[in-house]
Swiss-Prot record:
Family indicated by similarity: Belongs to the fucolectin family.
SMART domains with a match to the protein in the record: FTP
Paired cysteines (S-S): C73-C168, C104-C105, C130-C146
Top-rank taxon: Eukaryota
Residues that, per the record, bind Ca(2+): N58, D61, N63, S72, C168, E169
Subcellular location: Secreted
Protein name stated in the entry: Fucolectin-4
Residue ranges of the motif Cell attachment site: 101-103
Length: 179
């Protein structure tokens, strides 16, 4: 436990030297997609004919293919949907990269919030906000930088409206010390 605490303190020290809004990776650190190591879940999975293609884990499979029917995207149902990855440990997160669905419905993601923190209260929706997806073109991949690096275990994408949430890839870019 001591080693983890010391590493976390070094990460906090490193990020405290960053300017707010900076995308700079501090010396001695690298950015790595830690979502690949995590476990994904979502508010409700699409039902019906294409339900087998809609699993939450599809958004962290390392595949940016934006065609839903190729089996690498997730799809929710219901009002105010959310998708979440449990990173299984706490990381210092600089940004989140999202790949939007490309074969249709790209406008649905508009207004989604990217939330990062250590709480599962309200399914992670009460965690601090990293960014808001104002709009994202159909099939587009874009990186959303947090105003400053954030510390958290859970990354939630929450869509506060009556619409389905469809994500083809979610990459959580954490700052890791170079070994």
């Amino acid at each position: 436990m001591e080693v983890k605490t010391i590493m976390l303190l070094f990460q906090i020290l490193a990020i405290s030297t960053l300017k707010q809004g900076s995308a700079h990776v501090p010396d001695g650190y690298v950015e790595e997609n830690v979502a690949l190591r995590g476990r994904a879940t979502q508010s409700a999975q699409l039902r019906g004919e294409h339900a087998a293609l809609a699993h939450a884990s599809n958004a962290i499979d390392g595949n940016r293919d934006s065609n839903y029917h190729h089996g690498s995207c997730t799809h929710t149902e219901g009002a105010n949907p959310w998708w979440r990855v449990d990173l299984l440990q706490v990381y210092t997160i600089a940004s989140v990269t999202i790949t939007n669905r490309g074969d249709c419905c790209g406008e649905r993601i508009s207004g989604a919030r990217i939330l990062i923190g250590n709480s599962l209260e309200n399914n992670g929706i009460n965690n601090p906000q990293c960014s808001v997806i104002g709009s994202l073109a159909t099939g587009e991949t874009r990186t959303f930088h947090c105003p400053q690096p954030m510390i958290g275990r859970y990354v939630t994408v929450y869509l506060p409206k009556i619409e389905s949430l469809q994500l083809c890839e979610v990459e959580v870019n954490a700052l890791l010390p170079v070994n």
